[in-house]
Amino acid sequence: MEAGLEHLSRGTGKHVARLVAVLEPYYRSMETARNVAALANELGIADVVVVANKVRDNADRSAIAEFCRAHEMRLVGEVPYDGQLADVERRGAAPIDAAPGSPAVVAIEALAGPLASDAPMQVRE
């Protein structure tokens, strides 16, 4: 689904087992993820997890981890910032096909299985 709250407010979350909120290390993005997580909880989605995207350095990592702790959000993974993906996106190609060994694609592949599984996910500190 596309980013935003409108999908949840339309009732599309009725049969959702796990909601993944993706946030970037920017205040507005983190606040949006917090709002998504809160709405998901209100709608009865019990398993809400957070994945950090476009993480550049330890400052980004720390800011995201601190925000998630402060708002009781379960941070379960991160995808590093990867300049290759901007080039791939401009070409309209799929990152997994056009840049299969890139750091971001490798991180996404590592997260895909656990995110799709019914098993509980380990929270990152």
Task: Give the ranges of each region predicted by the language model.
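Conserved catalytic-core segment of NTP-binding enzymes
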Residues: 1-78, 87
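Short, electropositive, low-hydrophobicity segments enriched in small/polar residues
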Residues: 8, 81, 96
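C-terminal accessory "lid"/substrate-recognition subdomains
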Residues: 54-58, 62-81, 103-125
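C-terminal boundary of histidine-terminating zinc-finger modules
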Residues: 91-106
